[in-house]
């Protein structure tokens, strides 16, 4: 029996931001036979337009339960996405940029883990990537492996031997690979959102790290970019 057959109908939680990476991660989970629930975090981010994109993507993926959880990380600040700090637009630079949100993926994965255990799901998918990315420390394979260990230690299901699997299927893909994977899965990349600093009329700015990586990914993949840039 194939792995997909074994997974048929088994529930997975998809951390869904509304971005291209999380959409493709969810598409891979669906292709593998999982029944999908999605968790989107409304953390009072600058680019709140991604929350509407998450709704569109969830519907396209056939998610049967989509929870949008409010969590005001602007109360902490410390990031261009949650504070009055300009979003860098000088290209992808070495080091960790100001768009890094302190401990964001640790927080989000912890919430997804709680959602998973509460609903009996044992699989969590997220779209982190450690190749074409902005250098965030919580996107690295070492972080995912460490959180996997934490999940098994810190939960009732984990200590009872049922365990969880943290899936990061895009971990070692380039942005071009991800764009091609979206096309292969039949996903409409145009419904996703990547920009950190949207224009007042609802366009991608075209200059932030996330826009640059997205645009380059489609170009390198030889695919038409459906994104509307300013």
From Swiss-Prot:
Lineage of the species this protein comes from: Bacteria, Pseudomonadati, Pseudomonadota, Alphaproteobacteria, Sphingomonadales
Co-factor binding details: Binds 1 zinc ion per subunit.
Metabolic or biological pathway: Purine metabolism; 7-cyano-7-deazaguanine biosynthesis
PANTHER family registered for this protein in UniProt: 7-CYANO-7-DEAZAGUANINE SYNTHASE (PTHR42914:SF1)
Organism: Rhizorhabdus wittichii (strain DSM 6014 / CCUG 31198 / JCM 15750 / NBRC 105917 / EY 4224 / RW1) (Sphingomonas wittichii)
NCBIfam families: 7-cyano-7-deazaguanine synthase QueC
The protein's name: 7-cyano-7-deazaguanine synthase
Record-level Gene Ontology MF annotations: ATP binding; ligase activity, forming carbon-nitrogen bonds; zinc ion binding
Superkingdom of source: Bacteria
GO biological process, one term: queuosine biosynthetic process
Binding sites annotated in the UniProt record for ATP: 16-26
Family per similarity comment: Belongs to the QueC family.
Record field: catalytic activity: 7-carboxy-7-deazaguanine + NH4(+) + ATP = 7-cyano-7-deazaguanine + ADP + phosphate + H2O + H(+)
Known role: Catalyzes the ATP-dependent conversion of 7-carboxy-7-deazaguanine (CDG) to 7-cyano-7-deazaguanine (preQ(0)).
Cofactors that this protein relies on: Zn(2+)
Keywords: ATP-binding, Ligase, Metal-binding, Nucleotide-binding, Queuosine biosynthesis, Zinc
Positions annotated to bind Zn(2+): 195, 205, 208, 211
EC number: 6.3.4.20
